[in-house]
Amino acid sequence: MGDPASSSTWVAKKVPSDSEISDNLSWRNVSVSQVQAAPKIYEQNIRLSGSMYDDPLFNYFRDDTDDQWTRTTDFTPSASIGQSYILCLELPHICYLPNIREYFVYYEVHNDIFNLQPGYSYSSNTCFVPVVKSHYFTDVPYEILFKINHLVQNGTLSGPTLDDNFYRLVSPGYERIDRIKRALEKMSYLKKTCLNPTNWLSEQYKKMRRSRVLTSPNITLDDDGLVYVYRVQITPAKVYFYGPEINVSNRVVRNYAADLDNFLRISFVDEDCEKLRSTDLSQRSAPGNNTRRTALYNRVLSVLSNGITIGDKHFDFLAFSSSQLRDNSAWMFASRPGLSASDIREWMGNFRNIRNVAKYAARLGQSFSSSTETLKVHKYEVKEAPDVTNGTEYVFSDGIGTISADFADEVSKKCNLTRFTPSAFQIRYGGYKGVVAIDPTSQWKLSLRKSMSKFQSDNITLDVLAYSKYQPCFLNRQLITLLSTLGVIDSIFELKQQEAVQQLNRMVAEPQAAIDAIELMPMGEITNIVKELLLCGYRPDVEPYVSMLLQTFRASKLLELKTRSRIFVPKGRAMMGCLDETRTLKYGQVFIQASNSADDRGKSVVTGKVIVAKNPCIHPGDIRILQAVHSPLLGHMVNCVVFPQLGPRPHPNECSGSDLDGDIYFVSWDPDLIPTRMVAPMDYTPAPTETLDHDVMIEEVHEYFTNYIVNESLGIIANAHVVFADRQSLKAESTQCIKLAELFSIAVDYPKTGVPAQIPHELHVKEYPDFMEKLDRATYVSEGVIGKLYREIKKQNPHIRHFTKDVATLSYDTDLIVDGYQDYITEAVWFKEEYDFKLGNLMEHYGINSEAEIISGCILKMAKNFTKKSDADAIRLAVKSLRKEARSWFSEMGSDESGDGHKALVAKASAWYHVTYHPQYWGCYNEGYDHRPHLISFPWCVYDKLILIKQKKNIARKMLDLQNRMRRNTILG
């Protein structure tokens, strides 16, 4: 039924309209449910027979095994289901009813009487509900209207209450727009529906006029690489508006920055925010095995074909990146005079010679990859280098070129990299995509190969997507399964997991263990903050900020061990693949030079046997055992795995059919993990593609996107492989697993080829191992290595200590209090309120429970309409931007750090600490947000100032101790 909040059974009396006759007046049993989302709607072809049990009135159980129910959309004429938060269902008197208590947490039986009153549709159209728009005589800006729709869709506002007075109150002609935005933002965190929004807004405006409103409720962005983007989720029965949300920009939105509000990200999800299943869009009937498109298929295709209207803007389909396609997401654009979605596609490049729909769609999406704009490179500064085939059918240089050392330094600076210059960059340049690695001998800024060219484009800006750097590596269930298949014994993995757990347990109690752990497994921007705090004497089990971050880090790693068997491998790295341009490496050899830790202190060349793999990997031949050798000519290559360009077949292609256009490889030189045998790699030659006899039309791209949802089978194949590898004696070498590996390769290539994988009936599974935690399916206790690891890690307790008033009393550090801090208390309280407001909004927006999770990026759980995989970067960037904004508030008083200016800065930092940590301020920033915890990350935005204070106090204490010892020694002497 879709996330029920509560349910009750009532005796209802229907109130007829004047036109109804009195005979219709009747008493009825009804079930009333309050829902947070629309229910999943099913339909059934009615059987015609004389039996009363075939009557639709009595045949209402969806799980009847004799019937096939099909997913459908809102069947009511005015789309009433999608506009309703209370559902009233009439219950037949003479039919057996299920035990409703089993399905609803909050359930009551009432004998009261309530009256059903006629309702009406309040949505501006019935295709997308609920969507409202302002009345024609009231000017409400798009950003305000978007927020109002969000409030209606999450139940904070009731659509029928939005009258002329309401729209007048949210018009810039009545109130300042920053106050309107702030009031609506505050409204979105009310825990119940605001039934009188005009009064509520009026009261909020009065409070704001009396108080100091510092900034917009949105986090300030002063980084050219970040943008705010609006997002819409479309379900079978409803739509949900989100944002604006912080995103890394891409080539397209940077070029059309003035039209940012005309871009929209859409995604298609089910009512419970899970991905749509292929069977929801297309059902296969038994006779003749024919497929039938459902109403959900038509809804997705209709949205892509016809667009979506929000206020005065009509958004049309634009394109989608490869990652968006996997997430069933796409970009849309609202045309304006002189610029349409078609115009933008024309600007992106010339795609007319691409006659395959899947490839055409992929090339359109190439420009939408999140990237950092660097420098312009003129065509005469680019060399066209030949590809390396080595006389074989393979392209050894597939996706890789070179960059000169000097130009690499310039690009690094544009990427804000000051400590090192990466050895390789993943790039987009014009119609080229792939990797460029440093060539110390090259005088050309860029040397690009034909395999990197995907379409024609006049764009000459070099965009960077990623670069080579220190990256820790981890085992996962697929790697463990393959290594186990190849002979690595179970006890090895059990020992590795035990060592990882011991390291996590030590880091929350021992300072040096914590420093070592976060250097090997960094937590992003806050790694240095935690490290500096530990180095200046704070203990990981005492200081609340450090403690909560490390405990959350531990909890997240334990969760990864439990759900993914993600075991840290110290003797290994995740590395970008590159090509040996010197031709010194032989087939079977690789060059590996790795940084020792995240801060790039020292590096070492690996020699000896190594294993190399590329995730995802499910064929035993995907694990390659190679020989790492030292090659002086490749000494400039750091944190890359360099493959030879010699031999019968490229090693990257042997690893899951990979290439060198930016893929990251698992590399380990741990002798315990190197199998005693290696099997032949699988043939990853892609299926032949269909070539059209005409230019690809955008309507064909719409259909391809929709068919992708129908045919996408990677998850099904991967899950089936897990089950068969766990149950079969040959593990991943079993007949079933080898066949699934072949199908998996076809499914991986589907976005490029358009050829779907067809899974035979005998490879479908009905029972799952316990470690997959499929609570709604039949399960068994796994006797394999993954099952053993899973049950062992379940014994660990991911305890996280919370910041309470008692903790505040015990942990308040008087060392951080300096003379003059009182002068900045009032200002510090203002800034603390602002910071907490924005950070709390982020936490609630993404459904993140704790401050430590959002600050560290170690998110344990989030709202179902977001995923860690897709949204982790946006969250990290939002927090980074907020910290940067807070530092700008701190610097408002000036940047003079000498003499009195320095004293003022440390006094201000001291005040920030005091209003956060002192017990008298505990909980005082939550007015109107009683459900929010007391947040403590605010003062650590200026951690460098606080650490200076702490270090000075430490030095003074040491000097005093030294003087006392000398005095005692003098007396004793």
Where are these regions (language model features)?
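Beta-strand-enriched accessory nucleic-acid recognition/scaffold domains that flank the catalytic cores
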Residues: 2-657, 664, 668-973
